[in-house]
């Protein structure tokens, strides 16, 4: 990982990302910041389950990753770090840590499956994913988006591969967190580390 990409990943703020212009499995990432906030609070199990479901089903669908996925992974890594730290005294945090580790293994498996196929090079910088030419329209129009999906090349090859590559890089940037998990999370963390 380049130092520039590592710094970008570790310093990125939720407000730096134009979520409403990033694709997900079921639309756009407009509501991602709200769901991250619910997960960060780790207060109410039902709310955490609902937000986690919304994020994970929109970030990965049938082994396909989306434009919002690598950015989502950055913030889920930070939330995992907090959940692991609080897991001993907060049952919601304990639940969330286990679920996130399983989801990370799923995302990394998607990266490896894609990486084994012939693919384009990733964009040189994580921040390149936010170049204007790759962002979708400012205003969300479901019909317009559906028409765009019918085009031959919805995403340029290097951009599409970058959804996978930078999702992997996001987790890699927080590898030290995975190496220091509480004992009860050692097995799922080891499964994630094996895929890094």
Where are the regions a protein language model picked out?
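N-terminal "cap/leader" segments of large eukaryotic alpha-helical scaffolds
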Residues: 1-46
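HEAT/HEAT-like alpha-solenoid repeats
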Residues: 33-45, 74-86, 176-179
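HEAT-repeat alpha-solenoid elements in large eukaryotic scaffold proteins
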Residues: 45-57, 104
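Residue-level detector of extended alpha-helical repeat arrays and alpha-solenoid scaffolds
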Residues: 48, 69, 73, 90-93, ...
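Residue-level signature of the C-terminal ends
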Residues: 58-62, 79, 83, 107-114, ...
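Short sequence/structural elements of tandem HEAT/ARM alpha-solenoid repeats
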Residues: 67-76, 116-122
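Eukaryote-biased recognition of C-terminal alpha-helical segments
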Residues: 122-196
């Amino acid at each position: 990982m380049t130092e520039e990409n590592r710094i970008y990943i570790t310093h990125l703020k939720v407000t730096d990302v134009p979520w409403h212009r990033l694709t997900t499995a079921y639309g756009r990432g407009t509501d991602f910041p709200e769901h991250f906030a619910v997960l960060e609070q780790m207060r109410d199990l039902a709310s955490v389950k609902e937000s986690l479901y919304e994020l994970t089903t929109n970030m990965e669908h049938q082994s396909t990753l989306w434009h919002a996925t690598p950015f989502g992974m950055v913030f889920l890594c930070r939330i995992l770090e907090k959940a692991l730290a609080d897991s001993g005294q907060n049952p919601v945090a304990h639940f969330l840590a286990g679920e996130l580790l399983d989801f990370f293994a799923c995302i990394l498996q998607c990266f490896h499956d894609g990486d084994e196929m012939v693919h384009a090079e990733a964009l040189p910088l994580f921040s390149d994913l936010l170049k204007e030419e790759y962002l979708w329209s400012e205003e969300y129009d479901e019909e317009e988006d559906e028409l765009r999906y019918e085009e031959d090349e919805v995403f340029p090859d290097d951009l599409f591969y970058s959804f996978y590559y930078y999702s992997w890089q996001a987790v890699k940037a927080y590898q030290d967190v995975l190496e220091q998990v509480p004992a009860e999370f050692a097995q799922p963390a080891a499964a994630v580390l094996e895929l890094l």
